[in-house]
């Protein structure tokens, strides 16, 4: 059975922390592919600083060297707010027999019960969680306790051994705006940022 990982984010910009956790996601779950899904109009986050077209281009450039990585614009071309459940449904229709895995950080896990149709979502996809520094499963809201306990036991939720890197896109944007420093950004994406004058003051 084909295993497909889905990795949504604003990627504003994509950085080495994203690539590191995507590789760990692929390695630990044994995925055939990881599909990066830059958001169009994300419901749970503030507006991005770069356009959707620029963020998509940067992700395509940054992921080109790993054959397991693919990029989809399905969240960008949809109008209005994009919800994870709707995105997963698109991939379920495309790959009806595949095992789907959705990657999220532990901060998102703690809010999962507030997501649109979350109980239907977790029936359609498995969940891989990258823990952020300082987070613990003991902090999980009580609304998720029964589901999480069962899902950890049956393997439909996996906690990755690789932690989420403590890299902030906000900090990277600040460095780019203030000093033009592109540390932590994949070289191909850094070149694109310079060539297109992104994140300048």
UniProtKB/Swiss-Prot annotation:
InterPro entries membership: Cyt_trans-like, NadD/NMNAT, Rossmann-like_a/b/a_fold
MF annotations from Gene Ontology: ATP binding; nicotinate-nucleotide adenylyltransferase activity
Function: Catalyzes the reversible adenylation of nicotinate mononucleotide (NaMN) to nicotinic acid adenine dinucleotide (NaAD).
Keywords in alphabetical order: ATP-binding, NAD, Nucleotide-binding, Nucleotidyltransferase, Pyridine nucleotide biosynthesis, Transferase
Coiled-coil portions: none
tRNA-binding among keywords: no
Name by which UniProt lists this protein: Probable nicotinate-nucleotide adenylyltransferase
Pathway: Cofactor biosynthesis; NAD(+) biosynthesis; deamido-NAD(+) from nicotinate D-ribonucleotide: step 1/1
Keyword Transmembrane helix applies: no
């Amino acid at each position: 059975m084909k295993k497909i990982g889905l990795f949504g984010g604003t990627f504003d910009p994509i950085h080495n922390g994203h690539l590191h956790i995507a590789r760990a996601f692929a390695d630990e779950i044994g995925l055939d592919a990881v599909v990066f899904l830059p958001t169009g109009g994300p419901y749970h986050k503030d507006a991005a600083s770069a356009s959707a077209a620029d963020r998509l281009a940067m992700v395509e450039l940054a992921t080109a060297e790993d054959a397991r990585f693919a990029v989809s614009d399905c969240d960008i071309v949809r109008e209005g707010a994009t919800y994870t459940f709707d995105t997963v449904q698109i991939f379920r229709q495309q790959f009806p027999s595949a095992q789907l895995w959705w990657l999220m950080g532990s901060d998102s896990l703690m809010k999962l019960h507030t997501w649109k149709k979350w109980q239907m979502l977790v029936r359609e996809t498995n969940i891989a969680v990258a823990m952020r520094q300082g987070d613990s499963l003991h902090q999980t809201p009580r609304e998720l306790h029964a589901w999480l306990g069962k899902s950890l036991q049956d393997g439909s939720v996996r906690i990755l051994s690789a932690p989420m890197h403590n890299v902030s896109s906000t900090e990277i944007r600040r460095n780019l705006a203030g000093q033009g420093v592109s540390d932590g950004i994949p070289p191909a994406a850094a070149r694109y940022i310079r060539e297109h004058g992104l994140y300048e003051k």
